[in-house]
Design a protein with these regions (language model features):
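Extracellular/periplasmic catalytic domains that process cell-envelope and extracellular macromolecules
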Residues: 132
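Low-complexity, intrinsically disordered Gly/Pro/Thr-rich segments
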Residues: 120-129
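M16 family metallopeptidases and their MPP-like homologs
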Residues: 10-63, 68-119, 135-143
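His/Glu-based metal-binding/catalytic segments typifying zinc-dependent metallopeptidases
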Residues: 1-7
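Short, hydrophobic/aromatic alpha-helical segments in well-folded domains
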Residues: 8-9, 127
Length: 143
């Protein structure tokens, strides 16, 4: 959605609209709960328009199937990111610490890779309809 340069948010809000230099989305995972964050720096004059565009992108995911070209691009990015997290002893121990703190076993990594490889556009749309409910989100704007 917004984790890399070719993402939907970057394409729309940076490249098409020019509202910001960068916009990102990521999960903030904790032991008992997680939060999905979207962050950017945009001018005061385009702040409301930026939020509107983020909501439009959520609606697109809820109402239209992701095409296979985009899905494969995101799959490759996600698998590359997971593998990059294993590049060195500090990254490895950080990943294992996360597994231990969250009660996950050693197969979690392999299950994650398999899920990324096998998820379908229909499953993504179902998940978007379950979790991307704009009325359930909080907006924090700092000026």
């Amino acid at each position: 959605f917004g984790g890399f340069f070719g993402s939907r948010l970057m394409s729309n809000i940076r490249e098409d609209k020019g509202y910001t230099y960068g916009i990102h989305s990521y999960f903030q995972n904790h032991v008992h709960a997680s939060a999905w964050m979207i962050s950017t720096e945009a001018g005061r004059d385009v702040c409301a328009a930026t939020i509107t565009e983020v909501i439009k992108e959520m609606e697109l995911l809820r109402n239209e199937l992701v095409d296979m070209e985009e899905l494969n691009l995101v799959r490759n990015y996600m698998i590359g990111s997971l593998l990059g997290d294993l590049d060195g002893p500090f990254q490895l121990i950080g990943r294992w610490k996360n597994y231990v703190l969250n009660g996950l076993d050693e197969n979690y990594f392999y299950k994650s890779i398999e899920t990324i490889k096998s998820v379908t556009p229909q499953e993504l749309q179902r998940l978007a309809n379950t979790y991307l409910q704009p009325d359930d989100f909080y907006e924090l704007v700092v000026i």
